[in-house]
């Protein structure tokens, strides 16, 4: 049986990564494969949206460096408390892209101290395997909590250079650490099962209403994304942009994502 036909719960039982196991388990429990991408500029906006969306998401994706009034105690600690209250995980969309020693410092140090609080982060493969090693070292030196890394294999923006040979090389880098690299930001299934990998695929550019924006973002429907092999849909402006009600839209996208998943595994 292909992994695309297997439930999240079954995948959780045998996955090598404790981060992936926990994520699959809470997805099954909450019946949600929705990641809320909350790109805002204030702590108040961030926490208010997370409070509204927390009950229906499995993951919140942040760009923490866009928060004008950021402070660790004022921004991160309340966010972590909300993640415990509503049982979701935190993904800092940092997109690391430097040599190993540099990303190690960026991940563990500075004002953001990402390794201390983000369950998951991500990186480009452009600098090679050293980026994985550097980030893993930072995680191990910072916390006893398990951490996971996503590699950026494909992007949803028009004109992206992340395709073809670049994507293939990124997959090879991901194979260098089965425990720490848990999957990809990608537009479709990335394979690997014949070699014992069960990668989580998270896909941005998902919209039920909009087709794109003036800056090159291109949207696909929930069904298209899940049918292509994605495990988690990443939705941002579709949840709260253009005056939308995040509570209503959150449930709408949660149900759409979960129904598409149930169809894929033959349970709907």
UniProtKB/Swiss-Prot annotation:
Keyword annotations of the record: Decarboxylase, Lyase, Pyrimidine biosynthesis
Binding-site residues, substrate: 39, 61-63, 93-102, 219, 237
GO molecular-function terms, A-Z: orotate phosphoribosyltransferase activity; orotidine-5'-phosphate decarboxylase activity
Active site: 95
InterPro entries according to UniProt: Aldolase_TIM (IPR013785), OMPdecase (IPR014732), OMPdecase_AS (IPR018089), OMPdeCOase_dom (IPR001754), RibuloseP-bd_barrel (IPR011060)
Enzyme Commission number, as recorded: 4.1.1.23
Top-level EC class: lyase
SMART domains, A to Z: OMPdecase
A biological-process GO annotation: 'de novo' pyrimidine nucleobase biosynthetic process
Any single Pfam family the record assigns to this protein: OMPdecase
Catalytic activity as recorded in UniProt: orotidine 5'-phosphate + H(+) = UMP + CO2
Superkingdom of source: Eukaryota
CDD domains: OMP_decarboxylase_like (cd04725)
Pathway(s): Pyrimidine metabolism; UMP biosynthesis via de novo pathway; UMP from orotate: step 2/2
TM helices/strands, residue ranges: none
Family: Belongs to the OMP decarboxylase family.
Name of the protein in its database record: Orotidine 5'-phosphate decarboxylase
Lineage: Eukaryota, Fungi, Dikarya, Ascomycota, Saccharomycotina
